[in-house]
A protein has these predicted regions:
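C-terminal motif of bacterial Sec signal peptides marking the signal peptidase cleavage site
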Residues: 18-21
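Bacterial N-terminal signal peptides that target proteins for export
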Residues: 1-10
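A generic "folded-domain core" signal
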Residues: 23-249
Length: 249
């Protein structure tokens, strides 16, 4: 990913969020699926994002516990510090997303923008296409077990960024990244991905008389990356300012 461009887009998104609320502009279609008659019970412990999303009232924890839990999650994600236009910030994504890029895999890369303990975190989604040549993509489709989500270029937070991925023993590949400021509907989409057995990603160039597209199965590592970033997002969102300060200091 073009880190300088992504960092600039994060700053732009953070500024936009301060000026106005962002509505959902994605499209959602129900797919025809066979209903299952029984659900499998799971003994797995709820992850932080599940606890906070499903909570009917605010979860109260001691400040030190908030700071400790948040710091632990952020350290796993290796936050990057940046500064531009006299505004400093942290941007956070999963190492699994970086590993996918290094392996030449197209993927979804969720990330956080953090300005200061006094400001809530901002969630972004990067759609990352990697191929033999540039596509000039303008549309991304995500197919889960039950739904299809479509994002066109008008819903992106910036122009699609182009970069190159180099390999030691194989030809270079071209990379295109579209970044989107996530809405509540997008968070629902990410959770839907986590619940799906298989997810298909389709990167498209449709604003042309000669459309082209590439599709692939979403890397399994993306699911853990999504869960990790959602955990950090909800832990930060629900922490006190002092707990946030201790976690990022």
């Amino acid at each position: 990913m073009n880190k300088r461009a992504i960092a600039g887009a994060l700053l732009l998104g953070l500024s936009v969020l301060l000026l106005a609320s962002c509505g959902s502009v994605s499209t959602l279609e129900t797919k025809a699926v066979t209903q299952t008659t029984a659900s499998e019970a799971t003994a797995a412990e709820e992850q932080p994002y599940e606890q906070y999303r499903n909570a009917t009232e605010k979860i109260k924890k001691p400040e030190e516990q908030q700071a400790e839990e948040l710091k632990k999650v952020l350290q796993q994600l290796n936050p990057q510090y940046g500064k531009a236009d006299e505004l400093d910030f942290w941007w956070v994504t999963s190492p699994r997303c970086i590993e996918n890029e290094a392996a030449g895999k197209s993927c979804i890369a969720p990330m956080l923008g953090i300005l200061a303990p006094s400001a809530d975190p901002v969630l972004f989604i990067a759609f990352n296409y990697i191929g033999g040549e540039y596509m000039d993509m303008d549309t991304v489709e995500i197919h889960t077990d039950e739904y299809k989500y479509t994002y066109s270029s008008g819903t992106f937070s910036m122009e699609v960024q182009k970069d190159k991925v180099t390999f030691q023993n194989s030809p270079d590949k071209m990379e295109e990244t579209a970044l989107r400021l996530a809405t509540d509907d997008d968070i629902d989409m990410l959770v839907d991905i986590l619940k799906s057995d298989e997810v298909l990603l389709r990167f498209e160039k449709f604003n042309t008389a000669k459309p082209i597209w590439e599709e692939c199965t979403m890397p399994e590592e993306d699911k853990q990356a999504i869960a990790d970033v959602l955990n950090a997002y909800y832990l930060y969102l629900n922490a006190s300012e002092m707990a946030r300060a201790k976690a990022i200091s």
